[in-house]
């Protein structure tokens, strides 16, 4: 059966709400990540904010490389969502999968803003389909060490 975008979002919110309630009983915080698919209800700032309004105890994994899918400004996205962010994925974008700092996302600037905002959590490096994952990981780790130690 065909479901509209809104129906899918409502079902997703209901399921997430149930998961969050069960997890809370176990002392677990549930996070949702902005997703890099134009058809996803969590691919844009407004979609993420809607889920946060529906599920007050749902938290965010902020992925630096995904808001570009909706052509949204990464700094605007951070400011809109930062109060609920408890984890950050460092992902840069290029024509191919690239190391953090090698693509067109302003990684040094956005990660600097995140740190300046008081974020004290981890920065997880994320690459999707890199030809040489090890080399990409080493370059990304070096970028983070050189700029954020």
Q: What annotation goes with each model-predicted range?
A:
Residues 1-60, 69:
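Active-site acidic/histidine proton-transfer and metal-coordination neighborhood
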Residues 13, 17-20, 24, 49, ...:
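A structural alpha-helix within SAM-dependent methyltransferase catalytic domains
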Residues 17-20, 59-64, 115-116, 120, ...:
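Short, basic, helix/turn surface patches
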Residues 27-33, 57-61, 85-87, 96, ...:
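Structural preference for beta-strand elements that scaffold enzyme active sites
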Residues 41-45, 49, 66-120, 128-138:
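Gly/Pro-rich active-site loop or hairpin
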Residues 134-149:
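C-terminal helical cap(s) of enzyme catalytic domains, especially alpha/beta-barrels
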